[in-house]
Amino acid sequence: VTCWQKAVAIEKVGLYIPGGTAPLFSTVLMLAVPARIAGCKEIVLCTPPGKDGKVHPAILFAAETAGVSKIFKAGGIQAIAAMAYGTESVPKVYKIFGPGNQYVTAAKQLVSLKEVAIDMPAGPSEVEVIADESANPAFIAADFLSQAEHGVDSQAMLVTASESIVKPVMQAIREQLDRLPRKEITEK
């Protein structure tokens, strides 16, 4: 008896890239590059268009660079349903990847009961930094702000036994926050 393990790529995958206040081109890369490396034959991407009816150029560039097969201007639960069940234009996929709001997460969980596989139910962005007095306050602040700018439901926590690090971290957050283009969202 000979046993072996064989890795086989999922033939068709769907990537959901949320819209919102910033183009998430890094999410395109984080999802499409592994799909491409794994050998997926068809990579379908759904993302809502902007107010001008167009997909942000950074999303398009990242998708083309990473080898996405098809891009559709569809967002929210409609996009999840289209990829799960297929439409006249959107092909049915075998697994859906990507973040989204609570409605997208619920839609992904629902279709995963019978139709397709999903990556995981993604929740709000969160970060917890465990630091002592040797930590760089500017780095901690940058870690906090990089997650907090994702949305008003994001959370950032500092765990420390050193009171001496707290004030410098708060000061670094204030300084960096003033330079952020998404300050209004981040400070909520």
Predicted features by range, described:
Residues W4-Q5, G20, D52, A63-A66, ...:
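Structured catalytic cores of enzymes that bind and process phosphorylated ligands/cofactors
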Residues M30-V33, L60-A62, E88, V111-K114, ...:
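Short, solvent-exposed amphipathic alpha-helical segments in soluble enzyme
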